[in-house]
């Protein structure tokens, strides 16, 4: 089968066809102020409707605590989720255990207690917690998905039906992926983090150092079915000068506190970026605090990717650096949104 010159150009632009090299070259660099404005497309009502649909989905009362690989067998984690002290550690088999972070005896902070042979031993009076109910201390359901640790807090929302496991998006095989988890926190609520991620139109304007040539190919209608509730975006990741990596990505919200970006075409097809928002409580000024736990699970079938996997200790910090730069901006977006909502000045 032969192609005309026009057909060849169309095929070369098809995002489903990957070039031999992952990089592309922009014909010309468009100055930031000359790119197409997106404010008309980024309709507050449309974004708000997508947020409302996400908030209506079941979470099963599961909250992300942190990166699985960071929880070792020698020291516990201490976390505050929805104002509740939580402690998490690994037992002698390496299985995570979770429960209240306050010792039931006299209130010692269990996050400061050591783990000995899988047992958490309170450093005030030696109460030993193996993960079973002890002296008024009751364990909490906990889940390790290989990337993240989750804890289930049924007391937070008794209207939610508890689920046996968190609502997880499809992921590439972990043994064939590079995994990085970045965590930060800010003065906002979970809905502000999710709303930020359900606004893909801000990408090339707000993050010009990372994204160029962003086009929202399709956005969900306000009364769409679940299977159509996705934002599809063509975007190029900026490398240097006119050198870019063009991809197509789909943004979905599988549960109220999670937004997932799937790379569906282009370099890294099958890779995902999961953005999870965990409510922490309030700060000394009474402002809500929310943690962002963002997991990047990158994969590729290119031969060179195997080399990148071997360089995991170097790739991880680089991926975290990139996420940190983006979230410095996106947290400012989320905090501004929360401030405007709290003062009745938020549009829409």
Please provide the spans of the model-predicted regions.
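Rieske [2Fe-2S] iron-sulfur-binding domain
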Residues: 5, 66-170
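N-terminal short leaders/motifs
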Residues: 9-45, 91, 95, 99-102, ...
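A generic secondary-structure signal marking the coil-to-beta-strand transition
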Residues: 61, 75-77, 84, 147-149, ...
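C-terminal catalytic domain of Rieske-type non-heme iron oxygenases
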Residues: 5, 164-348
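A short, structural micro-pattern
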Residues: 59, 136, 143-145, 269-271, ...
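Short Pro/Gly-enriched beta-strand edge/turn motifs at strand-loop
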Residues: 59-68, 72, 124, 131-132, ...
């Amino acid at each position: 089968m032969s192609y005309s010159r026009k057909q060849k150009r169309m095929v070369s632009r098809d995002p489903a066809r990957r070039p031999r090299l992952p990089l592309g070259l922009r014909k010309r660099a468009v100055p930031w102020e000359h790119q197409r404005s997106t404010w008309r497309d980024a309709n507050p009502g449309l974004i708000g409707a997508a947020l409302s649909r996400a908030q209506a989905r079941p979470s099963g009362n599961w909250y992300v605590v942190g990166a699985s690989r960071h929880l070792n067998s020698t020291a516990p984690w201490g976390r505050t989720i929805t104002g509740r002290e939580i402690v998490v550690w690994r037992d002698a088999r390496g299985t995570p255990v979770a429960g209240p972070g306050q010792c039931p005896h006299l209130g010692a902070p269990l996050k400061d207690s050591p783990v000995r042979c899988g047992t958490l031993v309170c450093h005030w009076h030696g109460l030993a917690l193996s993960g079973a109910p002890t002296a008024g201390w009751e364990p909490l359901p906990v889940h390790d998905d290989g990337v993240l640790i989750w804890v289930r807090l049924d007391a937070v929302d008794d209207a939610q039906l508890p689920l046996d496991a968190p609502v997880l998006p499809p992921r590439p095989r972990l043994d064939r992926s590079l995994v990085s988890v970045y965590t930060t926190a800010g003065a906002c609520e979970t809905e502000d983090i999710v709303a930020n991620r359900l606004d893909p139109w801000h990408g090339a304007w707000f993050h010009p150092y990372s994204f160029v040539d962003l086009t929202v190919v399709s956005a969900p209608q306000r009364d769409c079915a679940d299977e159509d509730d996705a934002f599809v975006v063509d975007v190029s990741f900026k490398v240097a000068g006119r050198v870019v990596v063009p991809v197509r990505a789909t943004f979905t919200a599988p549960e109220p506190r999670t937004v997932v970006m799937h790379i569906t075409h282009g370099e890294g097809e099958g890779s995902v970026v999961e953005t999870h928002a965990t409510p922490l409580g309030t700060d000394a000024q009474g402002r809500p605090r929310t943690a962002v736990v963002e997991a990047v699970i990158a994969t590729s079938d290119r031969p060179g990717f195997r080399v990148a996997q071997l360089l995991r200790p170097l790739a991880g910090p680089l991926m975290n650096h990139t996420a940190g730069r983006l979230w410095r901006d996106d947290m400012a977006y989320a905090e501004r949104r929360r401030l405007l909502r709290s003062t009745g000045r938020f549009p829409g």
